Curated annotation (Swiss-Prot):
Family classification: Belongs to the Bowman-Birk serine protease inhibitor family.
Chain ranges passing through the membrane: none
Superkingdom field: Eukaryota
Site (Reactive bond for trypsin): K16, S17
InterPro entries named in the record: Bowman-Birk_prot_inh, Prot_inh_BBI
Lineage: Eukaryota, Viridiplantae, Streptophyta, Embryophyta, Tracheophyta
Disulfide cross-links: C8-C63, C9-C24, C14-C22, C31-C38, C35-C51
Record protein name field: Bowman-Birk type major trypsin inhibitor
MF annotations from Gene Ontology: serine-type endopeptidase inhibitor activity
């Protein structure tokens, strides 16, 4: 499965399978080095990016705790 392309993710969707297949829809200032497919969000100003990789493994923790 390799390295998770994001250390944490707030907008994460994962399948119910084991291992899970996860995507992260967080808007990033830049993608991590581990992210292979980085897509620029159209019309974003300042520019924002989404890592379009699908990660197979343990879901990432959330970046921000919801108060």
């Amino acid at each position: 499965s390799g390295e998770r392309p994001w250390k944490c993710c707030d907008l994460q969707t994962c399948t119910k399978s084991i291992p899970a297949f996860c995507r992260c829809r967080d808007l990033l200032e830049q993608c991590s080095d581990a992210c292979k497919e980085c897509g620029k969000v159209r019309d974003s100003d300042p520019p924002r990016y989404i890592c379009q990789d699908v990660y197979r493994g343990i879901p990432a923790p959330m970046c921000h705790e919801h108060q």
